[in-house]
A protein has these predicted regions:
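Hydrophobic beta-strand scaffold residues
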Residues: 44-46, 64
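Short, glycine-/small-residue-rich phosphate/pyrophosphate-handling segment
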Residues: 52, 57-81
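A contiguous loop/helix-start segment that scaffolds small-molecule binding in enzyme catalytic cores
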Residues: 6, 11-20, 29, 34-36, ...
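Glycine-rich beta-strand-to-loop/alpha-helix junction loops that act as flexible
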Residues: 1-6, 19-23, 48
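Active-site nucleophile and cofactor-binding loops and adjacent substrate-binding regions
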Residues: 46-52
Length: 167
């Protein structure tokens, strides 16, 4: 589905461009799509978008780093369908206490909170942003102690990003 082919101008995956599939370009199918287009000798152009992490920070009017608090941002996902490499499990990453953006995890929020609590503490701020940068975006702010109840009240099930950290 590429410009120059009959009746097709753009290819979108899940309502997003391939590089921002499900608002998580690092987990999108763009690599597979590029290989297929090249194999078929079909010209294409990739137009980059704004990452979900940047969109969420902007929407929340918040920075992701702050001197003396956190100077590192970790972008990850919660591994349930694909195994995470050794050392990249959430509890390993949480040891850094950096600002963390967790993709594809809202359905596993109880497990995520359990892995974060020992490292960040119950009072650590957390935001769950549903459909960031879409007209119907919504979000919940809380702490690791109360976020599960707040998210359950909103019934977020998919297309949500979790931002955690003291910034």
């Amino acid at each position: 589905m590429v410009a120059g082919h009959p009746g097709v101008k753009n290819h979108f995956t899940n309502g997003c461009s391939p590089s921002t599939k499900a608002f998580a370009p690092q987990y999108g199918a763009i690599g597979e799509q590029i290989r297929e287009l090249r194999a078929l000798d079909i010209p294409f152009e990739i137009i980059p978008g704004v990452t979900a992490t940047a969109a969420c920070a902007a929407m929340l009017e918040s920075e992701l780093t702050l001197p003396g608090v956190a100077q590192t941002v970790i972008l990850t996902r919660y591994g349930t369908t694909s195994p995470m490499p050794e050392g990249e499990q959430l509890h390993d990453l949480a040891r850094h206490r950096a600002t963390m953006a967790i993709h594809l995890g809202v359905r596993q929020l109880p497990a995520i909170v359990a892995e974060l609590l020992p490292h960040y503490g119950a009072d650590c701020p957390i935001a769950v942003i549903h459909r960031a940068s879409w007209p119907d975006q919504d979000w919940v702010l809380g702490t690791l102690a109360d976020i599960q109840e707040k998210v359950a009240a909103k019934d977020f099930r998919r297309t949500a990003l979790i931002l955690v950290g003291r910034v």
